[in-house]
């Protein structure tokens, strides 16, 4: 068993090697303060035949890690929570580009949170633990990576802030990479205001992150290298292509290949290339279908990259900085509170907005918070198979759908002025040819406005790409699905004219240099300006139907009157809600009553509640202290009996008053009683 301590970037990390889970390919216990994570890597010895990297990353939270028992009926951890899925994706997106292109061995990386102090950053800790475990496993020649988080307070950047400091920050920037370059970025603005970050400041933050990663990765490699396993997989020389087949494709089928490249729809493009492969297979039996498809893919990819880098033209004939045509339509769905159809090229997002009450907020339990938290702004992204012409069933939300919805939410969240408002936006992707998450951001921002939600500014999103060959590279604005698939970078950036509110960067390379990222940021700003101009023009044409939108009426009553509004077993409040078709939130300590729904119904509900309480007060005013009454037993409870009074209303005869007279009552009995007090709107009775 080996213990390793590493001090870097404002934190002290401890690694216990060969202590637990020793049957895994590699395992370690990672410790940062009171946070402990078990990281393990397991590799199967037989490769898969399919052409993909069979990597699975699972980040798992255990309730006992924070001294909790799972909430709900089943007291056991169930399906993964959103935070676990998003963190798993974050780690996967960091590590996947590091593997050799022809690595085909099923690999599972598991991160299990065993203990957690809420002040420590779980995502940074989990990624660093995964990186160390993978580096020690030595399953392939993989570089060491690490992560850091950057916050901003009082115009100063902070590396790896505590949770309490991050809550006060205007920036949340998560960066991972090697000591040479960055390979994954997640960013969002924080705070009560929009807090969009300007591009030069973003570069400054990324430079700070790169220095932190360089320091940590250098230490990791120096300290962990002596503890590595024997190298399992040595990168091969790659696929050896048949030159005769490549010449055949270039000379006889080149025009058809270009036709396929220029096809805008994925299904249409696949049909063209499948037809080419079929023709060659029938005419040249000496080539296998697999060999033909691999060679066809190589020629296609080479030509796409040549077009972009050398000719400065894209497969759909756009210039490198050109954004596809945009069409925006509003108010398509009469019963929703807002609906926006945003079409950019062959990508189409229908975002629907609905406003709700506090009861509609999503409640989450997690290790990052001591108590359950309410998510008041929800953004759900759906990617049905028909949007790319596929025939398959629609199931539960995928990891990708959760990730895209989370990105759109982070882009728009700070643009909302009233953070207490409960809002749900749903993006239905009806057509997709790249950048669907950024189309969701654009449509979502307009949907907020169309719902009558007060926003600081419109927010637009654009996906940037890059193609590189040697020392040459080209940055692409508003990438299509083909450019995403064949390119080297997917850099999604959202913001307004002032700066950036959210971004996400992934790469297929081992990393991206800062100067390329900054060029992409500046080019994205120009694309955003163009998109925002069209969005502002569309905004001017939106007519907000305030009569259809739900309104909220808030008023106060005496706190002791809240129980009267609720009624026995919730009977009164249920009747009010059903009668007026509204939503009601009640606050017992303050006496606040919040009614939400159609404006006319809300006002009628308020009037009804006030009249109802007034009638109860009038009933009390009919009685006097020491007045003797003939009452009837209405119901028996543990602490006494409720009696129906002759002039209306009811009073409580407590059990101790019945016991001292040795009286046994049953429902329906008549009894003489005396009014002894009025307490919080209730009449207290004694036997006369």
Curated annotation (Swiss-Prot):
Name it: Polyribonucleotide nucleotidyltransferase
Q: Catalyses which reaction?
A: RNA(n+1) + phosphate = RNA(n) + a ribonucleoside 5'-diphosphate
Q: What EC number(s) does this enzyme carry? A: 2.7.7.8
One Gene Ontology MF term = RNA binding
Alphabetized, the UniProt keywords read: Cytoplasm, Magnesium, Metal-binding, Nucleotidyltransferase, RNA-binding, Transferase
Q: Name one GO cellular component term.
A: cytosol
Coiled-coil residues are none
């Amino acid at each position: 068993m080996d213990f390793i301590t590493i001090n870097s970037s404002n934190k002290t990390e401890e690694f216990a090697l060969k202590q637990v889970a020793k049957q895994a390919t590699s395992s370690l216990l990672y410790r940062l303060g009171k946070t402990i994570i078990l990281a393990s890597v397991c590799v199967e010895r037989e490769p898969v035949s399919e052409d993909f990297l069979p990597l699975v990353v699972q980040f798992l939270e255990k309730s006992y890690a924070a001294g909790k028992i799972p909430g709900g009926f089943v007291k056991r951890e169930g399906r993964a929570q959103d935070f676990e899925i998003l963190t798993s994706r974050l780690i996967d997106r960091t590590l996947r580009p590091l593997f050799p292109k022809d690595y085909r061995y099923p690999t599972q990386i598991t991160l299990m949170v065993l203990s957690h102090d809420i002040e420590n950053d779980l995502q940074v800790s989990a990624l660093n633990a995964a990186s160390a475990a993978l580096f020690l496993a030595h399953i392939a020649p993989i570089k060491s990576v690490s992560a850091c988080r950057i916050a901003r307070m009082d115009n100063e950047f902070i590396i790896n802030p505590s949770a309490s400091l991050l809550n006060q920050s205007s920036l949340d920037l998560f960066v991972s990479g090697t000591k040479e370059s960055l390979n994954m970025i997640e960013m969002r603005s924080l705070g009560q205001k929009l807090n969009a970050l300007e591009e030069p400041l973003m570069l400054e933050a990324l430079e700070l992150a790169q220095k932190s990663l360089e320091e940590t990765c250098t230490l990791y490699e120096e300290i962990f290298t002596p503890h590595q396993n024997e190298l399992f997989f040595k990168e091969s020389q790659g696929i050896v292509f048949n030159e005769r087949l490549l010449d055949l494709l270039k000379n006889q089928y080149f025009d058809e290949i270009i036709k396929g490249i220029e096809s805008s729809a994925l299904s249409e493009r696949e049909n063209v290339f499948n037809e080419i492969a079929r023709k060659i297979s029938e005419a040249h039996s000496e080539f296998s279908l697999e060999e033909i498809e691999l060679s066809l893919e190589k020629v296609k990819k080479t030509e796409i990259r040549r077009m972009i880098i050398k000719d400065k033209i894209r497969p759909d004939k756009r210039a490198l900085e050109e954004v596809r045509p945009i069409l925006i339509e509003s108010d398509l769905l009469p019963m929703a509170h807002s609906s926006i159809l945003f079409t950019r090229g062959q990508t189409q997002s229908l975002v629907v907005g609905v406003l709700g009450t506090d009861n509609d907020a999503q409640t989450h339990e997690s290790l990052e918070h001591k108590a359950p938290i309410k998510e008041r702004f929800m953004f759900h992204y759906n990617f049905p198979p028909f949007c790319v012409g596929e025939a398959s069933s629609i199931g539960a939300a995928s990891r990708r759908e959760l990730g895209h919805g989370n990105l759109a939410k982070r882009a728009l969240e700070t643009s909302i002025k009233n953070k207490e408002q409960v809002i749900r936006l749903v993006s239905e992707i009806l057509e997709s040819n790249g950048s669907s998450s950024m189309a969701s951001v654009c449509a979502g921002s307009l949907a907020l406005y169309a719902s009558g939600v007060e926003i600081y500014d419109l927010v637009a999103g654009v996906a940037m790409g890059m193609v590189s060959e040697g020392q040459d590279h080209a940055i692409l604005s508003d990438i299509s699905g083909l450019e995403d698939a064949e390119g080297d970078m997917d850099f999604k950036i959202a913001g307004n004219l002032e700066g950036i509110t959210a971004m996400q960067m992934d790469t297929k390379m081992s990393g991206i240099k800062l100067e390329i990222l900054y060029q992409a940021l500046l080019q994205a700003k120009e694309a955003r300006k163009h998109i925002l101009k069209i969005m502002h023009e569309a905004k001017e044409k939106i007519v907000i139907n305030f009569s259809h939108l739900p309104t909220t009426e808030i008023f106060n009553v005496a706190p002791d009157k809240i129980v009267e509004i609720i009624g026995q077993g919730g009977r009164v409040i249920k009747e009010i809600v059903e009668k007026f078709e509204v939503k009601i939130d009640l606050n017992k300590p303050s006496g606040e009553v919040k009614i939400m729904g159609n404006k006319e119904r809300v006002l009628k509900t308020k009037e009804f509640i006030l009249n109802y309480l007034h009638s109860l007060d009038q009933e009390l005013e009919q009685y006097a202290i020491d007045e003797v009454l003939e009452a009837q037993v209405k119901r028996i409870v543990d602490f006494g009996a409720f009696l129906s009074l002759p002039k209306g209303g009811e009073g409580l005869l407590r059990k101790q008053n019945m016991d001292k007279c040795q009286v046994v009552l049953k429902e329906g009995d008549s009894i003489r009683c005396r009014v002894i007090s009025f307490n919080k709107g209730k009449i207290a009775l004694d036997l006369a």
